[in-house]
Each structure stands twice: as structure tokens, then as C-alpha cells.
Amino acid sequence: MQLNLGAIFLALLGVMATATSVLAEPHRHQGPIFDTRPSPFNPNQPRPGPIY
């Protein structure tokens, strides 16, 4: 019985670790990421503003 409880505890610990890493992942990238490199495959190029 002790071994079974240990296995359950380890499985629960692994699930908790993966859940926290998955939940914490989207908070690293906040706001839109604008790529400033000129490229024909780049959908997020900043628009050239008016020259003052």
C-alpha cells in the first residue's frame, strides 16, 4: 500500500508541475510582438509613418 501511495504522489506531482508550466507559459509574452526586420513573409511589419 505504501508503494501505491508513493506512485500516486509522484504522478500527482508530475501533473502539477506540467500544469503550472503550461499555465505560466502565456504570461511571458505580453502584448503584440512587432518584428522590425524587412521581409516579404512578415505580417507584423510596422507601417512607415509620416516624416515630420
Swiss-Prot record:
GO CC, alphabetical: extracellular region
GO BP: antibacterial humoral response; antifungal humoral response; defense response; defense response to fungus; defense response to Gram-negative bacterium; defense response to Gram-positive bacterium; innate immune response; killing of cells of another organism
Subcellular location: Secreted
Keywords recorded for this protein, A-Z: Antibiotic, Antimicrobial, Fungicide, Immunity, Innate immunity, Secreted, Signal
Induction data: By bacterial infection (at protein level). Up-regulated in hemolymph 6 hours after immune challenge, levels of expression increase for first 24 hours and persist for the following two weeks (at protein level).
Pro residues bias spans: 40-52
Effect of H29R: In strain: 2CPA51
Propeptide, chain numbering: 25-26
InterPro entries the record matches: Mtk
Protein name: Metchnikowin
Provenance organism: Drosophila melanogaster
Lineage per the UniProt record: Eukaryota, Metazoa, Ecdysozoa, Arthropoda, Hexapoda
Name of the encoding gene: Mtk
